[in-house]
Amino acid sequence: RQRQMCIRDSIKSLSKTANGRLSGSAKIDFETYIQRQYFKQIIHEANKRLLTMSNHQFILKLKEEANTGRKTNEGLDLSVYSLVTDSERDVKTLSGGESFLAALAMALGLSDIVERSAGAIHPDMMFIDEGFGSLDAQSRQQAIEVLGELAGDSRMVGIISHVTELKEQIDRKLVV
């Protein structure tokens, strides 16, 4: 009888842990925990490029479980860490240009992780639609350099844009 109760308590504790209901711990379920592990990898790869594109001004961070709460996206929220001011803030405070750079970096980070994890999958082509109009000249140049490195890795990068300065910076283009 006591052995059965011990087993039942262990299973109950395991169930609470897997479902994010264990008292005194982070309130995320097992599925979210696994998603966070993959998301951390994507953010790590994204930050490699974001550092370059933001001129070493900021990186993205996954908010800690204790700061996420149940009203959020269950532990998958991002924040921005400023290397200039040594402070952390919500991603909603990013300017339009900064948001574009962060989104581009995340897309490239995801591509890196998919390629690394899937092995046989190698995205040979990437299209980026707009966003460059929200960048200042320096940020635009840094984004173009990062994309140029991708194109140098035997990938085709297509950019859909109305920004005149961007058209002048790209050697091969299709004008419609």
What are these regions (language model features)?
Residues 1-4, 8-176:
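Terminal ABC-like ATPase head and other globular end-domains that cap long coiled-coil arms
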